[in-house]
């Protein structure tokens, strides 16, 4: 959707998501305008990003590379190979975001391959709130990364974390962004069944109504000036 807003393709094309013949598939497709690299199979994206960042340093380019990885994706060994490589070569012009929503294709991450600790039952809420149970950051620190942990629903925290990451020298940074998948949507919130599918047409108006009633774009974001964002964001 962000790429549609940026003008890479018409917003109406979003309705073709994951349909046969569509340029918008579950993983980025090279046929899609604006896509230079296909991030599937899972786990390859961080390696690719490390390569771009390292090449920029070798070529003395003032580039900073940002990448997003999933917590379910972190089941893949290649993620951790890339983590070791970035640390070894001190790729400090790389910032990774880990979308820590505790959900992957089949179920909750802590039931399949825990990053924090084993989950008993289906209630992830208490683990999301209890920082004493978070072990993911320790894993990344052990690989030599600078670790920042934030509430991924707070734009001002995201902005502050990016600023800190850009100022960090000698090591790559990972921003562990704790989120609730499908937040505030009755049909989707914290439900693994919605991991990778588009809603049916009869549900779309309900979803749009729920979103319109709860969210607005802060003036600071529109203006590109974050200095007063914390005062504008009330939730």
Label every PLM stretch briefly.
Residues 72-78, 151-159, 225-227:
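Active-site glycine- and acidic-residue-rich loops that bind
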Residues 1-89:
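Cofactor-binding active-site loop characterized by glycine-rich and histidine/acidic residues
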Residues 60-63, 102, 110-161:
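Conserved thiamine diphosphate
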Residues 70-73, 100, 179:
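Active-site metal-binding loops of divalent metal-dependent hydrolases
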Residues 155-213:
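Glycine/aspartate-rich loop-and-adjacent alpha/beta segment that forms the canonical ThDP
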Residues 214-235:
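Conserved N-terminal beta1-alpha1 strand-loop-helix module at the mouth
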Residues 93-100, 104:
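Short internal beta-strands
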Residues 63-67, 94, 171-179:
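Generic beta-sheet signal
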């Amino acid at each position: 959707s962000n790429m549609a807003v940026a003008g890479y393709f018409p917003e109406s094309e979003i309705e073709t998501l994951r349909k046969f013949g569509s340029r918008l598939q579950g993983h980025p497709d090279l046929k899609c305008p604006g896509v230079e690299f296909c991030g599937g199979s899972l786990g390859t994206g961080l390696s690719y990003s490390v390569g771009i960042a390292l090449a920029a340093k070798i070529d003395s380019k003032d580039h900073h590379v940002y990448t997003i990885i999933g917590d379910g994706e972190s089941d893949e060994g290649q993620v951790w190979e890339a983590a070791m490589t970035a640390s070894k070569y001190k790729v400090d012009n790389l910032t990774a975001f880990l979308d820590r929503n505790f959900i992957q294709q089949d179920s909750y991450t802590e039931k399949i391959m825990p990053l924090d600790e084993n989950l008993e039952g289906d209630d992830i809420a208490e683990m999301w709130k209890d920082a004493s149970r978070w072990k993911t950051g320790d894993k990344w620190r052990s690989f030599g990364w600078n670790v920042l942990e934030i509430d991924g629903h707070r734009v001002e925290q995201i902005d502050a974390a990016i600023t800190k990451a850009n100022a960090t020298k000698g090591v790559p940074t990972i921003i562990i962004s704790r989120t609730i998948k499908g937040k505030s949507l009755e049909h989707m919130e914290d439900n693994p069944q919605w991991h990778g599918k588009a809603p049916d047409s009869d549900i779309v108006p309900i979803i749009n109504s729920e979103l319109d009633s709860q969210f607005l774009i802060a003036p600071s974001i529109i203006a590109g000036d974050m200095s007063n964002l914390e005062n504008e964001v009330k939730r």
